Amino acid sequence: LKCNKLIPPFWKTCPKGKNLCYKMYMVSTLTVPVKRGCIDVCPKNSALVKYVCCNTNKCN
């Protein structure tokens, strides 16, 4: 799986076991991701942070 880094078009190949790409947003600025990468389990959203996860190449 290939996931975008914080600034596309840069991306990386995920290590074994991390089969999801994710984007993390601050709830106050939902249009600007603050973190992107590979992850094994999609984290739960909180009052301050929202996660968007997906499982296809460079979908984040």
Swiss-Prot record:
Disulfide-bonded cysteines: C3-C21, C14-C38, C42-C53, C54-C59
Subcellular location: Secreted; Target cell membrane
Domain of life, per lineage: Eukaryota
Keyword terms of this UniProt record: Cardiotoxin, Cytolysis, Disulfide bond, Membrane, Secreted, Target cell membrane, Target membrane, Toxin
PROSITE patterns linked to this entry: SNAKE_TOXIN
A GO CC annotation given for this chain: membrane
Family statement: Belongs to the three-finger toxin family. Short-chain subfamily. Type IA cytotoxin sub-subfamily.
Name of the protein described by the UniProt record: Cytotoxin 4
